[in-house]
């Protein structure tokens, strides 16, 4: 059984999603957004760090996964996003959590089946996969998608490692 905290970083809104995984079952524990205020970037980074630290204290996750920085047309936006990611990653590292990173394409592929999925498709699939009564808000759905992607990636690696070492009747299983 593992509790996974997924994070969709942003300098204004950072989404988070927490799931519990046991076997093939994924259970929704919580999600939401950390909304930063003001124009002072160092203060925003502290708000992200404090918010993620509080979520870690509340849910006690075993693993932490975050979306990788994409290439933005605006260099300033990409730098701010990278700094927001850094604040979240430091919070996870301070809590001694292993950190995994996934691209937006990997996340969308794991959740929807295509790396070109739209936000609405991700929201809908997260609602279906986690059996939620309503679709979560976009940033929270993206963060839950990060957690689901991490779970599926780990499941695939476990399955592959098991197959590579099990040999029966001259064939690998």
UniProtKB/Swiss-Prot annotation:
Residues annotated to bind Mg(2+) 1: 8, 139
Gene Ontology CC: one annotated term: Holliday junction resolvase complex
InterPro entries hit by this protein: RNaseH-like_sf (IPR012337), RNaseH_sf (IPR036397), X-over_junc_endoDNase_Mg_BS (IPR020563), X-over_junc_endoDNase_RuvC (IPR002176)
Keyword Nuclease found: yes
Domain of life: Bacteria
GO biological process: DNA recombination; DNA repair
Record CDD domains: RuvC (cd16962)
Gene Ontology terms, MF aspect: crossover junction DNA endonuclease activity; DNA binding; magnesium ion binding
E.C. number(s) listed in UniProt: 3.1.21.10
Subcellular locations according to the entry: Cytoplasm
Cofactor note text: Binds 2 Mg(2+) ion per subunit.
Reaction(s) catalysed by this chain's protein: Endonucleolytic cleavage at a junction such as a reciprocal single-stranded crossover between two homologous DNA duplexes (Holliday junction)
Cofactor names: Mg(2+)
Enzyme class: hydrolase
Keyword Ion transport: no
Binding site for Mg(2+) 2: 67
Subunit structure: Homodimer which binds Holliday junction (HJ) DNA. The HJ becomes 2-fold symmetrical on binding to RuvC with unstacked arms; it has a different conformation from HJ DNA in complex with RuvA. In the full resolvosome a probable DNA-RuvA(4)-RuvB(12)-RuvC(2) complex forms which resolves the HJ.
Matching PANTHER family: CROSSOVER JUNCTION ENDODEOXYRIBONUCLEASE RUVC
Family affiliation: Belongs to the RuvC family.
Function: The RuvA-RuvB-RuvC complex processes Holliday junction (HJ) DNA during genetic recombination and DNA repair. Endonuclease that resolves HJ intermediates. Cleaves cruciform DNA by making single-stranded nicks across the HJ at symmetrical positions within the homologous arms, yielding a 5'-phosphate and a 3'-hydroxyl group; requires a central core of homology in the junction. The consensus cleavage sequence is 5'-(A/T)TT(C/G)-3'. Cleavage occurs on the 3'-side of the TT dinucleotide at the point of strand exchange.
Descriptive protein name: Crossover junction endodeoxyribonuclease RuvC
């Amino acid at each position: 059984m593992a509790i996974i905290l997924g994070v969709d970083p942003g300098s204004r809104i950072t989404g988070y999603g927490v799931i519990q995984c046991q076997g093939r079952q994924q259970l929704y524990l919580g999600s939401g957004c950390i909304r930063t205020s003001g124009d002072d970037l160092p203060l925003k980074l502290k708000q992200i760090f404090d918010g993620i630290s509080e979520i870690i204290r509340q849910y006690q996750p075993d693993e932490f996964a975050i979306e990788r920085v994409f290439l933005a047309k605006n260099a300033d936006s990409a730098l701010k996003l990278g700094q927001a990611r850094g604040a979240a990653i430091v919070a996870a590292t301070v809590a001694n959590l292993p950190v995994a990173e996934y691209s937006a394409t990997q996340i969308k592929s794991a959740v929807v089946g295509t790396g070109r999925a739209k936000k609405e498709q991700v929201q809908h699939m997260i609602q279906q996969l986690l059996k939620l009564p309503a679709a979560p808000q976009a940033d929270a759905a993206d963060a839950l998608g990060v957690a689901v992607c991490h779970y599926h990636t780990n499941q695939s690696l476990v399955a592959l490692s098991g197959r590579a070492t099990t040999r029966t009747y001259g064939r690998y299983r």
